[in-house]
Amino acid sequence: MELPRRALLLSALDLPLAALPLAARAQGGDPAAPIAALNTVLLANMRAGRAVPFASRAAALRPAVERAFDLPAILAASVGPRYAAFAEGAKAALLEAFTAFTVATWTANFDSLNGETFQIAPDTRAAGADVVVTSRIVPRSGEPIRLDFVMRNAAGGWRAVDILLNGTISRVAVQRSDFRSLVAAGDPAPLIASLTERAGKLAAGAKS
């Protein structure tokens, strides 16, 4: 999910299990655990910086991204109703392009450590059947940035299905207008090409 660098920098390093609502704990463990695991790899990449090749950092990050985010659900919500009509092969190609783009975005945005500190709120809140994990990045100077993960408990466990910047701005909603315009003709090929191109630019050093 593509976000500006300062809005992406977050971590879930110190969330005690006892602070979680009983309902969330009863439904399959800690909703923040996938985010904590993601951030372990993110912080390692940030410390390593550009001395480590982009491809190596992306390869290290991809499993954590796939565990932290329900990428098929995010993609389907971003594309909208046309997604269901795509052939299975097209869906698979689109998901691979979206996954590569998502991993490239996080890899590019987390390529250095500049004195930021990362926090996560000790309490979560319910959003229907979902749970919202609230995090902040506190820069060396300036105002903290709030970034909420909307976590859903499905067969694979807790995964994020959206990110809310400042607690309100849905990344899926922002992404939706972009994606849907590219599949307006019912063909996923333009979106696949766009995601592939953008991932390539990120790998080459272009920042989003």
What do these predicted regions represent?
Residues 1-16:
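N-terminal secretory signal peptides and thylakoid transit peptides that target proteins
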Residues 30-106:
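Early exported N-terminus immediately downstream of N-terminal targeting peptides
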Residues 103-145, 195-208:
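Surface-exposed, charged secondary-structure patches
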Residues 144-173:
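Short beta-strand edge/turn micro-motifs at domain boundaries
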Residues 164-208:
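Low-complexity, intrinsically disordered terminal/linker segments enriched in charged
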